[in-house]
Amino acid sequence: MSDTVFIGMDLGTSRTSITTSTGVRTTVWSYVGYAQDHVSRKHLGGRDKVFGEEAVENRMAVNLVRPLDKGLILDDEESRQAVRDLLEHIFDEASIPSGSTIYGVIGAPAEASVDSKALILSTASEFMDSIIVCSEPFAVAYGLDFLSDTLVVDIGAGTVDLCRVHGTMPKPEDQRTHHYAGDAIDARLAELLTKNHPEAQFSNNMVREIKENYACVGTHMDPVKVTFPVKGKPTEFDITAELSEACFGMVPPTVEALQDLIATFDPEFQQKMRNHVLLGGGGSQITGLSRAIEDALVEYGGGKVRQVEEPQYAGSNGA
């Protein structure tokens, strides 16, 4: 008789995490790199493809594919194949026993369309016997057992997903999504750096690493000084203001969506809801973000915001 394994998965634009009933948790960057030629293949130790951080590190020698955008699988054959390869890899990493019956729950953006969910189901069905696609912020709340009077904000690379949790499965009117997420911060930071320091040379990967290491919202953040080449010469730049502005851009659309979810809820429970806002996802680790959202909520009657523990696995744990 085959073993039964339950898995929860956060199939994210930037990172994919899996939690299994066998006690395994693992995360891989959502990138697949395919060898360009025989030299590339030799460089990769004879492998045709590599995954995650290794793929990004070898991006000059591979065809690098990032198959998800705004939390959804891109609808082209290259991306679908890359997701299949990525799922196969992460299942191998999770050491699921061969021949197991696999039941899975996959988190998706709060306002993902029916077609988008169908694409996730059809791709993942090659690896699982039964699958449910659920709202990613609801998965965070479910895993932490916050099932009533809670507003969950899941901040990923492609989307910021919000969900109003009130003791039932969320309906469409309980959910909101906006796209000023991690990728948008990267794009805005790159734009500001190009405008204010046109002589500096940098790549998208360098910008992402700066954000992940130093992201902060607030007027009292520590100075952020980084080194970029200028005509080949390493040169130091103070980018504190640019980074703060890029990160703060997430606050207004998030607060607007929160207030919309509060204002359209039963007035008797609105105060409880506004005082129980939960931040999850990789973007929740931005220093000062909880305080910035609280400060912005003062205009609407205030609120209390807290960050989940283990944001990397909060979604897959709940799923």
Predicted segments with their positions:
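Short glycine-rich anion-binding loops that position phosphate/pyrophosphate groups of nucleotides
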Residues: 158
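Nucleotide/phosphate-binding catalytic cleft detector across ATP-hydrolyzing
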Residues: 1-42, 49-155, 165-277, 284-314
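Positively charged, low-complexity, intrinsically disordered RNA-binding extensions
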Residues: 161
